[in-house]
Amino acid sequence: MTDDVPDVRRFWESLGLPGLVDVHTHFLPPSIQRAVYAVFDAAGPKIGREWPIRYRQSVDERVELLRAMGVRRFPTLPYAHKPGVATYLNDWAAGFKRDVPESLWSATFYPEPEAASYIEGLVADGVEVFKVHVQVGEFHLDDPLLDPVWGLLEDAGTPIVIHAGGAPVGNDFTGPAPMARVLARFPRLAAVIAHMGAPDLVEFLELAETHERVCLDTTMVFTDFWPQPYPVELLPRLVDLQHKVLLGTDFPTIPYPYAHQLESLARLDLGDDWLRAVCWHNGVRVFGLPGA
């Protein structure tokens, strides 16, 4: 996959940037990574379509590929799919951070009685980003067990990448309403809405417009693979939200070259300043530079 490198570097070099900040990448323990690949390979009910994953190299090879492409900061974004696994995932992610210092120290949680305790410790230790995935984990964002967690994260200002939308296949736990209820109680939560909230693009856009710390990530939206064209009438609002849109890709679990996500953003024709903000400046503002 080293042939992907020139196209990616050409993109950010043409914008005069020093690289990219990608806020939505995944690195998981090998056994769980294999299980995730198997779910996508089976194109089961939570995937809903063929999804040929392009990047299946080892952890070390994928890290080196991101580095070669010029991705300066990237997370692991583990996500707990059931009670009792968050601590295992978080311990593995902490080890990854030690081995890959430019990565964003990531962690996850699940609605369980001990969640507030381990989140409090992780925040104190300096975790840089959390991830939850309600479509996979099948839980409600406004579960009372998460109330103390949201309070801790709102006070800390730590970003949380939240897969709250119904893409690729919705269920009883997805959609904008639970996120809106959480934000009504914790309005300064630093939520990064994965996939721009697709398919509920308008509703999640409105949450970003009306809440100071809510941002959107671009993951897979705008690409040719994505089944839902982004409404043209919403593009001016994305320009207004230039400071709140963050580059995300879902690497390695994508069925096209990494550069295609970047090309899909460029062809929106929202201007080079918008691209610079999305692909670098916003991520640096939220997460800082490596070693800073």
Annotated model-derived regions:
Residues 63-66, 70-85, 92-110, 131:
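Short, well-structured secondary-structure segments
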Residues 26-31, 81-84, 112-115, 137, ...:
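Active-site environment of divalent metal-dependent phosphoester hydrolases
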Residues 3-4, 128-129, 139-246:
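Catalytic pocket-lining loop regions of alpha/beta-barrel enzymes
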Residues 56-66, 88, 111-122, 145:
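Short, acidic/polar
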Residues 25, 78, 107-111, 132-134, ...:
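A cross-domain feature marking catalytic cores of carbohydrate-active enzymes
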Residues 1-23, 30-73, 241-244, 255-292:
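Mid-to-C-terminal alpha-helical segments outside catalytic/metal-binding sites
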Residues 24, 66, 93, 122, ...:
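Conserved, mostly hydrophobic/aromatic
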Residues 45-56, 78, 104-113, 138-141:
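Active-site mouth loops of central-metabolism enzymes
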